[in-house]
């Protein structure tokens, strides 16, 4: 099950108070280095805007014509794609390659981010590491194979092999998520044969950020009982419906299992309202509670959650 449709996962993490450590905002003039840092925890970008919304920010030594337009704002994902899940992140803004939302105006980047609890692994090229969640399930937050720092995995290497710090393999997140999501443990390798070579002539490394989650599946007519003991519940994802023809299928006619595109849009809200911030909760898996998103289909309730 691919839970990390990237935007929806990050939205859930941003809205998860139990995982939140702290938050910050960073403004960087175009051409300078944007530096995001978490004293404790890992970066999750909430929003990044490129443009200009006032005439004073990043205006020193700029002619009035370059700071006059203050209705210029382009939401971007580049910074989140590269920084999410890292404890520290430095990006040269003139290398981000974003579209110019207002030509002739001197712009800046305004990034708002949170620091969340999570697990972070760095694997040098040709190496491997095992991600381990014990009895819980892995959920990948972000991953990159390439190089964003000249210092990491650089011991004994000539400078020429570590100077390209704008190296990102576009398929890293989906590849690692496909290998690891939902598993208790997962071994990942930092190899060109797995991720391709995004920057030939540069020695690369793999960074992976993940959280450990629990999962519960209850067939229609049953009840989901969650117990986090001394901790409290935080719902990460939930759906009442059917997305798999084999789950909760025993003794059911095939006609009740065919529709695997059945979702209840407010499942997460209802489960969160009944469970979040509590140590225990019980949620019924029935049409009376959730409504019937797909008549004549036998449904089930799937909840992914963390104890925080």
UniProtKB/Swiss-Prot annotation:
Keywords annotated in UniProt: Glycoprotein, Lectin, Repeat, Secreted, Signal
GO molecular function: carbohydrate binding
Signal peptide extent: 1-23
Organism domain of life: Eukaryota
Tissue and organ expression note: Expressed in eggs, but not in liver.
GO CC terms: extracellular region
Location in the cell: Secreted
SUEL-type lectin domain sequence ranges: 27-115, 123-213, 218-308
Primary role: Lectin that binds L-rhamnose. Also binds monosaccharides possessing steric similarity to the hydroxyl group orientation at C2 and C4 of the pyranose ring structure of L-rhamnose, such as L-mannose and L-lyxose.
Xref: PANTHER family: PROTEIN EVA-1
Protein name: Rhamnose-binding lectin
Organism of origin: Silurus asotus (Amur catfish)
